[in-house]
């Protein structure tokens, strides 16, 4: 009985870990948000030890595609821009099943701009580190089960989900995407 319960919990946990798992649902509330420019660069991207090789163009395209896939669902009236810099990555190679299953990692820096105010919302770039989803081959490793492109797509989708989570947090804490883009306290003052 305990084993069955553990398996069920594991399945639910694995499903929840994929950055693209919720794309078929309505987007999480993010205020009056519309992404206009979605720019990724990789001038200093560091390939981690034992990583598979991908080009900088592949890195940036995967991240911009995943970001568009997630944020293209928002259609608010206020425009915002993302500047994303890929700082490092590891695309896991095949390991030794069960004993050593390397994991893939992506590290990015995010800058968010408010178009109407022409200001940067992130005082300094916000760093995000994501790992591959656990459904990518937790026992044998994604190096055996996925191509480098598939690993990169998964990491990029996880990064886009992490960006969304960060923006939801900042909107709640600082009111980044409220009706007029001002923090909640300022909105209350201007409505009076």
How would you name each of these model-derived features?
Residues 64, 68-72, 91, 160, ...:
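Sec-exported extracytoplasmic/periplasmic mature domains
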Residues 47-53, 119-162:
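Short secondary-structure boundary motifs at beta->alpha junctions and helix caps
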Residues 17-61, 172-192:
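A structural "domain/chain start" motif
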Residues 19-32, 114-134, 161-176:
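Short secondary-structure transition/capping segments
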Residues 75-122, 133-145:
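Surface-exposed short loop/turn segments
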Residues 1-18:
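Sec-dependent bacterial lipoprotein signal peptides
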Residues 139-192:
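C-terminal/domain-edge helix-coil "capping" segments
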Residues 53-79:
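N-terminal, post-signal-peptide region of Sec/Tat-exported proteins
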